[in-house]
Amino acid sequence: MERDNGTIQAPGLPPTTCVYREDFKRLLLPPVYSVVLVVGLPLNVCVIAQICASRRTLTRSAVYTLNLALADLLYACSLPLLIYNYARGDHWPFGDLACRLVRFLFYANLHGSILFLTCISFQRYLGICHPLAPWHKRGGRRAAWVVCGVVWLVVTAQCLPTAVFAATGIQRNRTVCYDLSPPILSTRYLPYGMALTVIGFLLPFTALLACYCRMARRLCRQDGPAGPVAQERRSKAARMAVVVAAVFVISFLPFHITKTAYLAVRSTPGVSCPVLETFAAAYKGTRPFASANSVLDPILFYFTQQKFRRQPHDLLQKLTAKWQRQRV
């Protein structure tokens, strides 16, 4: 083996077939994933429990939020395997099937969250910009459940190839779980990876920005309804827009920018291992931002839903009062 600026390159292989020295992953990913697991798992369970407890009065946005929390919960359940893997220095002992499943769950959560947040934003857009139009109110919750079913089918179709490309391999005498694909399949993965970014992120992000631009113009107009109820409605819509945009910018945008750059460089012939390793480190360094979406989503829910935000406070007051009565 031949060392090249900290990157190991096997002799006789193409210059872009490198084995990276990624010690930063052991320091960065286990703590971040542990926080996401410890914080995100109970938060999403609470969101699901609260929405299910109010199932008779569910709005369309609540139905979308419930499915968003389910996607986050499924991903959080896969994190213990990744925490163990990176804490052991990128050693994967769980087999090829578990590797494919974990990679699929990551991208299914990522693109499911993007689409469900887009659905929530579009529902808010309809309520603000077309409040009296009857066509978007037909079907009620049943229509929302149909939309969620379509979203899950689309996400599964989008992300199923990740389970095909992801695989285990041997590097430095240990088994690793490739995130995107083995290096030998990098050229074949490129069209799919780029299409997934465009269809699974860029198009929903563009639609979301268009909705929020229309909403901002409508909210800034002075000829709308007046009064405290209308003002509260506008404030709630503004909060939703700011928080959802923040989730996209923090969680999704850096990850997709660095992933796209890495895919392009990885598939370019003649790229040296140090350059390739730099792009790989940038891409893998933004993975925690994408994972943080499982924590940010339930915070978004509580920040924008006043009714559900009051429930934990009321429950805490009841428990405190009961505890004080027992002490007397």
UniProtKB/Swiss-Prot annotation:
This protein's GO CC annotations: apical plasma membrane; basolateral plasma membrane; plasma membrane
Subcellular location: Cell membrane
Tissue: Abundantly expressed in various tissues including lung, stomach, intestine, spleen, mesentery, heart, and, most prominently, aorta.
Example GO molecular function: G protein-coupled UDP receptor activity
One matching Pfam family: 7tm_1
Swiss-Prot/TrEMBL keywords: Cell membrane, Disulfide bond, G-protein coupled receptor, Glycoprotein, Membrane, Receptor, Transducer, Transmembrane, Transmembrane helix
SUPFAM superfamilies linked: Family A G protein-coupled receptor-like (SSF81321)
Segments passing through the bilayer: 28-48, 63-83, 102-122, 145-165, 195-215, 237-257, 281-303
SS bond partners: C99-C177
Topology with respect to the bilayer: Multi-pass membrane protein
Any one GO biological process: positive regulation of inositol trisphosphate biosynthetic process
Keyword Ribonucleoprotein applies: no
Cytoplasmic compartment segments: 49-62, 123-144, 216-236, 304-328
Entry-listed glycosylation sites: N5, N173
Annotated function: Receptor for extracellular UTP > ADP = 2-methylthio-ATP > ADP-beta-S > ATP = ATP-gamma-S. The activity of this receptor is mediated by G proteins which activate a phosphatidylinositol-calcium second messenger system. Functionally coupled to phospholipase C.
Family: Belongs to the G-protein coupled receptor 1 family.
Name of this chain's protein: P2Y purinoceptor 6
